[in-house]
Regions:
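Short terminal alpha-helical segments
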Residues: 1-39
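Amphipathic alpha-helical elements of HEAT/ARM-like alpha-solenoid repeat scaffolds that form extended
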Residues: 2, 16-17, 48-62, 95-103
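Mixed-charge, low-complexity intrinsically disordered regions
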Residues: 6, 58-62, 112, 120-121
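Charge-rich, solvent-exposed alpha-helical interaction surfaces
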Residues: 20, 24, 34-38, 70-77, ...
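Charged interaction/catalytic cores of defense and host-pathogen modules
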Residues: 36-92
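Mixed-charge, Lys/Arg-rich low-complexity intrinsically disordered regions
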Residues: 93-131
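Short coil-to-beta transition motif at edge beta-strands of beta-rich domains
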Residues: 125-145
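Short beta-strand-centered aromatic/proline hotspots
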Residues: 144-161
């Protein structure tokens, strides 16, 4: 698992939690069931609890589903310093940036959430090619500058079958 920026969803774990939560809602589970299943499916541990509580609160708030327990748990993480614990070794500017993110999250969570939103599984995008279609792709020099092992194939066409 990695973290690439200070945003609330700037890491693998927050995105996994959000995606799995939506997946459980798509399957027809209640918000409470979905939260429990996320914890189980992702095999989360105590060290993941602060991130889990913050992401769960954010997603539920956006969907109009946030319960008092979810809010209380998220505010506890924000109040007791657990939300910043994983940022102890980060640079001062990253810690300040993350704290601003958490401050905005607190403000949002303490504001009234919107109406309950219906969550539907997105329809898959239609692929414009049919199975068996052949696609021709030209390798252009701009994409392979400085890679001599690939430059020899520039301006040639590759055929791909769908």
């Amino acid at each position: 698992m990695g973290t690439w920026d200070t945003s609330l969803y700037g890491g693998d774990l927050p995105l996994d939690i959000k995606d799995e939560y939506y997946e459980q809602l798509y399957e027809g589970h209640t918000p409470e069931e979905a939260a429990a299943l996320v914890w189980k499916e992702l095999r989360l541990g105590e060290e993941d609890l602060p991130v889990f509580r913050l992401i769960l609160a954010d997603v539920q708030w956006k969907l109009g589903q946030m319960t008092e327990d979810t809010l209380r748990n998220a505010l506890e993480v924000l109040d007791n310093g657990a939300a910043m614990a994983e940022w102890e070794g980060a640079s001062e500017s990253d810690r300040r940036s993350r704290q601003r993110v958490l401050d905005r999250l607190r403000k949002k969570l303490e504001s009234p959430q919107g109406p309950l939103k219906t969550v539907k599984r997105p329809k898959p995008k239609k692929f414009k090619y049919k199975i068996g279609d052949v696609i021709s792709v030209q390798l252009v020099p701009e994409l392979v500058k400085g890679k001599p092992e690939i430059e020899i194939y520039c301006n040639k066409y590759f055929m791909v079958q769908a």
